[in-house]
């Protein structure tokens, strides 16, 4: 039953799981939360808290879980750099931790036996994004506006202290370099995972580079949509024939972004299936609280004894229907 807009509680005396989500109003997280609830069902007591995109709030929520003596804490970090701080606090109680969806570094995970990560790999995300950019560049010769063989691009990244965002961008660049595709980066800016901020930053860049930009590459769909908001005001990406068009490529696969692919407003994204991520998280969590091996009864495997990676899949108009079906 619902206690408040940011708290869900399901009664079960046998075992308990506390989940902290970085923000409920993120479209992808909204579906992830729903799938977690569905997979856990009545198999455990489940408390899900909304961290409202505040690491301070999330830290307080960890204290709530500790005071309630939950059997496992699952955390979608607001800020990956706080993973070690959380591990230090929780490990004293010897409570298992699963980080998910936002990837902490291996050094932090190796500091405690009972901590793991489930979700995407920033390497996989960036590589998949690089692949979809490379494939589209090779198949659309007309997108090379100045015919110099280089991609004139804007790169939009998340928070300045986000290792995941930086890694996504770097692995994208690495893939393109390995495939002999050169980038001419007109600007590389931070938009803090925020659509409005991305739109404001893009407004400034369009004033300077509007006729030069050949790609907009964002490390998150939300920021990619912010870029779209900006360029649409100047008449770009408003035509299904893809005239006066700047290809935009994001990461995430949110329902709203997929709708814009359908409208020919953005070109592509790479996504994880939230149902798959929630299913893996739920199976591993239930195994742990029932004193089983984390991977018991699954075909899953660990990387570096700590990571269970859920792959990213490129999404364009060609496989869009399959991606949309995930959210139904």
List PLM regions with ranges.
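Flexible loop/hinge segments that line or gate small-molecule binding clefts
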Residues: 88-124, 149, 255-262
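Short beta-strand elements in bilobed, periplasmic/extracellular small-molecule ligand-binding domains
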Residues: 40-51, 155, 177-192
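Hydrophobic alpha-helical
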Residues: 75-92, 172, 186-259
